[in-house]
């Protein structure tokens, strides 16, 4: 059995020596000399610092292991070494949660009625469908619905603008043709 050095334990029964008290060296009196107890405490602290000056025993072998442990701790970062593919172009910036969809409110820009009427009259699809109807061909329900909606909108716009759709008689057409100067179109 190894020998153990006896130490003096300070208990409530024993009186406290001044040497056993911890003295803060920083609290030393400014401008005055240190007492012998303070000098002893300071010397003991300095001796402890000098005693543990060197490296720990076996540090030559354990230093390599510590470096390896440090490297392993650094690699634990999940962002480093990830095999997950990262898209270069962000497709969806804000993904709403399931069931929480904000309905998009369509703001219809109100056009000038004259411009809208002009667009409807120059609509190629509408003109082709009207030509097909005039030729006696049958068109699908969706096409017929489109034609009806466009014609209704045209009549609304004409009423709003105060334009009356007059069916010109053949005599009126003949008179306008006679009055025209053909040289204007050359």
UniProtKB/Swiss-Prot annotation:
GO BP terms: ribosome biogenesis
Keyword match Cytoplasm: no
Disulfides per UniProt: none
Cross-referenced InterPro entries: YihI (IPR007336)
Comp. bias regions, Basic and acidic residues: 62-77
Keywords: GTPase activation, Ribosome biogenesis
Any GO MF annotation of the entry: GTPase activator activity
Annotated region described as Disordered, given as residue ranges: 42-77
Protein task: A GTPase-activating protein (GAP) that modifies Der/EngA GTPase function. May play a role in ribosome biogenesis.
Assembly and interaction partners: Interacts with Der.
Family note: Belongs to the YihI family.
HAMAP family reported for this sequence: GAP_YihI (MF_01058)
Protein name: Der GTPase-activating protein YihI
Lineage of source species: Bacteria, Pseudomonadati, Pseudomonadota, Gammaproteobacteria, Pasteurellales
Gene that specifies this protein: yihI
């Amino acid at each position: 059995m190894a020998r153990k050095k006896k130490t003096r334990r300070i208990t409530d029964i024993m009186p406290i020596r001044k040497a056993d008290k911890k003295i803060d060296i920083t609290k030393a009196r400014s401008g005055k000399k240190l007492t012998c107890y303070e000098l002893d405490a300071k010397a003991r602290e300095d001796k402890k610092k000098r005693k543990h000056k060197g490296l720990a025993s076996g540090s030559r072998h354990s230093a390599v292991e510590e470096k390896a442990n440090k490297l392993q701790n650094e690699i634990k970062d999940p962002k480093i070494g990830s095999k997950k593919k990262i898209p270069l172009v962000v497709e969806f910036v804000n993904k709403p949660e399931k069931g929480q969809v904000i309905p998009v409110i369509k703001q219809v820009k109100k056009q000038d009625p004259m411009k809208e009427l002009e667009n409807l009259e120059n609509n190629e699809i509408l003109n082709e469908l009207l030509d097909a109807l005039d030729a006696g061909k049958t068109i699908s329900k969706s096409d017929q619905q489109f034609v009806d909606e466009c014609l209704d909108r045209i009549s609304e716009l004409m009423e709003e603008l105060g334009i009356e759709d007059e069916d010109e008689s053949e005599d009126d057409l003949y008179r306008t043709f006679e009055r025209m100067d053909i040289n204007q179109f050359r």
